[in-house]
Amino acid sequence: MYSISFQDDISMMPRERLMREGAEKLSNQELLSIFLRTGNKKETVFQVSQRILSSISSLNDLKYLTLQELQTISGIGPIKAVELQAIIELGRRINRAEVLQKEQIMGSQKLARKMQQELGDMRQECLVAIYLNSQNQILHQQTIFMGTVSRSIAEPREILHYALKHLATSIILVHNHPSGSVVPSRNDDEVTQHMKEACEMMGLVLLDHLIVSKSNYYSYREETDMI
């Protein structure tokens, strides 16, 4: 990892370079420096940016850092940690929208692989609902809950609310198992059955319920006759 010396030439400052040449011309260190704005008593903002980037193996690792982990980095206080997580999440959503917008789902495996990339490394369980039209094109993806997925928090009301809002005809549920095992629990079975019944009452179809880990996935449609 290299370090940039800006010296006193204002034309080389990241903000000025971005305005003159465009954001795509800036290095990761320069972009991060623009966001952080200031350093600390011992380091410039460029040195803080350099140290953050040196502490991770790739930019992708940034999205897995918790607020507490970000604040262990000298120069990153509570406010900057919150701001950094917010901008990372915004980038994640932009990327997800570009990838999933109007994509047609032809099978559970393809969607499972995509969701493995998104949820496979998460340390908490996350329940996501994906809403599709009659051509099985994705209309919307909504995170329903983060924590421990149970029937009590996977109530159909919120899930069905987004289906009606986006005029969906079918739903796919996806959640991750941080343990790495994708074997469904009894609770997973109950959530699946409960949601299937709720969807049928509303004239919707529960197409699948996927359980994903970093390296594997489980499809209720492929593995059971529940769906």
From Swiss-Prot:
Domain MPN: 104-226
GO biological process: proteolysis
Span(s) of short sequence motif JAMM motif: 175-188
Residues the record lists as binding Zn(2+): H175, H177, D188
SUPFAM superfamilies per the UniProt record, alphabetical: RuvA domain 2-like (SSF47781)
Keyword tags: Hydrolase, Metal-binding, Metalloprotease, Protease, Zinc
GO terms of molecular function: metal ion binding; metallopeptidase activity
PROSITE patterns reported for this sequence: MPN, UPF0758
Superkingdom, natural source: Bacteria
Family designation: Belongs to the UPF0758 family.
NCBIfam families referenced in this protein's UniProt entry, alphabetically: PRK00024.1, radc
PANTHER family: DNA REPAIR PROTEIN RADC, UPF0758 PROTEIN YEES-RELATED
Name assigned to this protein: UPF0758 protein SSA_1218
Organism: Streptococcus sanguinis (strain SK36)
